[in-house]
Amino acid sequence: MEIKNFFRSSSRSVKERKNIIIEEKKKKVVKNYYNFGYDYFDNKNLSFGYGGYKYDGRFKNNVKNIINFFKLSKRLRIAEFGCAKGFVLVEFLKKQFQVIGFEKSKYAIKNCHPLLKKKIINIEKVNQINKYKFDFLICKDVLPSLTEKQIKYLIRTAIKKSKKPPYFIIQTFKNKKNIDFYKNWDKTHVTIKNRKEWIYFLKKFNKKIYYSFNFIF
């Protein structure tokens, strides 16, 4: 079921993103970027990527709104798939929830929020989450970086293990004319769909999950 996005999009406008892509298109993206390393998160010399991802408490109110909407009690264990440095997850921890994070990037885990040093699990494959218990799963801006097979597996597993419907925030684009900009903005994306295509793809899970769209183009 589609709901409003609890997270605002990037501070950059669509026009700014398009201009960045035009300027950066001829530059070579290093392997470290594709492995979600330093260049992906903290290289300020790259116009794409995070360009320096530091904790500033930006997700405090977002998490508060999620807790209220989903009626999450502190007895629940909150999981985040693709938690990066844990800046969303730590806001749940600060509100006395049990938390667990799943992250592919060893760089992100090494540089995660200090309160999460022993709470983020390094995973290489989606099915590794089966080993762990959780009651509610959130997944922000990660699905496009997975294959369709991996996405379906993640959703089915989250539904099976969660006491609350899992929540997915999906980066996408509004129409076909922006597809090339979207592809070039984050080249770690492997599943490319616009809003309409995502809704169709998720139709079979519609009453069992919640999802929102983060339109970057």
List the predicted regions and their residue ranges:
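Class I (Rossmann-like) S-adenosyl-L-methionine-dependent methyltransferase catalytic domain
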Residues: 1-70, 79-130, 146-157, 164-217
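Phosphate-coordination loops involved in phosphoryl transfer and adenosine-cofactor binding
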Residues: 75
